[in-house]
């Protein structure tokens, strides 16, 4: 899980999801998981 100021889709499988006010990127590739912080 990378914590970044700006989260971006890295590949076409990445999805941007907002959970409890936190923006996250979910992907089939675990290296692409991010959250905004």
From Swiss-Prot:
UniProt entry keywords in alphabetical sequence: Ribonucleoprotein, Ribosomal protein
Gene that encodes it: rpmJ
PROSITE patterns: RIBOSOMAL_L36
InterPro entries: Ribosomal_bL36, Ribosomal_bL36_sp
Organism: Mannheimia succiniciproducens (strain KCTC 0769BP / MBEL55E)
Swiss-Prot/TrEMBL GO biological process terms: translation
Protein name: Large ribosomal subunit protein bL36
Top-level taxonomic group: Bacteria
PANTHER family: 50S RIBOSOMAL PROTEIN L36, CHLOROPLASTIC, LARGE RIBOSOMAL SUBUNIT PROTEIN BL36C
Cited Pfam families: Ribosomal_L36
């Amino acid at each position: 899980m990378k914590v970044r100021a700006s989260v971006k889709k890295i590949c076409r499988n990445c999805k941007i999801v907002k959970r409890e006010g936190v923006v996250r990127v979910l992907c089939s590739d675990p290296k692409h998981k991010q959250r905004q912080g």
